[in-house]
């Protein structure tokens, strides 16, 4: 295997590629074989479509694997991502399939399905169920409770009186 033999597992393809400047998106190492398979990371896309890194740019500008990009966005090195618990905290990082999102601006209290809260500002003592609100996996924005919100109620329902509005909520 003279032309196909590549570096062993743990070099530029398995986690270290994003940090060392290699591109694991262009070539993927398979465990046990120790060889690179061109274009395996993106079916239907050839490595040439990814394009080389222009001269003068740092090696970090090279395309990297999506899992490594997500790990970098969360402050986790790709090598920690693939090896389990990190040396710093002893806790494993997020799974490669979990999106790493920046915190949303504004109030961070989220109205989750089935969560119990209070209507505000008119009747703070009346509990309300937010079951009709979008869950945490929905689009950001409408599911965040803003000051003065009535939990998932239409403005007309909220104006008609607290007792009536609460009685119409599904339990």
Curated annotation (Swiss-Prot):
Modifications after synthesis and translation: Cleaved in vitro following UV irradiation to induce caspase-mediated apoptosis and this cleavage is inhibited by a broad-spectrum caspase inhibitor.
Biased composition (Low complexity): 84-99
Region Disordered: start-end pairs: 1-22, 76-156
Localization per record: Cytoplasm; Cytoplasm, Cytoskeleton
Superkingdom classification of source: Eukaryota
Keyword annotations: Cytoplasm, Cytoskeleton
Keyword ATP-binding assigned: no
Subunit annotation: Interacts with calpain-2 catalytic subunit CAPN2.
The protein's name in its UniProt record: PIDD1 alternative open reading frame protein
Name of the gene encoding the protein in the UniProt record: PIDD1
């Amino acid at each position: 295997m003279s032309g196909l033999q590549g570096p062993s597992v743990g070099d530029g393809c398995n986690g270290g590629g994003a940090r060392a400047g290699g591109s694991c998106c262009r070539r993927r190492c398979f465990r046990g074989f120790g060889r690179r398979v061109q274009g395996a990371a993106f079916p239907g896309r050839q490595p040439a479509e990814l394009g080389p890194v222009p001269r003068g740019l740092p090696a970090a500008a090279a395309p990297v694997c999506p899992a490594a990009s997500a790990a970098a966005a969360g402050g986790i090195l790709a090598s920690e991502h693939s090896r389990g618990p990190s040396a710093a905290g002893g806790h494993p990082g997020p799974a490669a399939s979990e999106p790493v999102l920046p915190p949303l601006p504004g109030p961070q209290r989220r109205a989750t399905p089935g969560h119990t809260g209070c209507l505000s500002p008119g009747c703070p003592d009346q509990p309300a169920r937010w079951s009709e609100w979008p869950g945490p996996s929905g689009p950001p924005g409408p599911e965040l409770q803003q000051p003065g919100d009535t939990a998932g109620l239409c403005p007309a329902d909220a104006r008609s009186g607290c007792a009536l509005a609460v009685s119409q909520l599904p339990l």
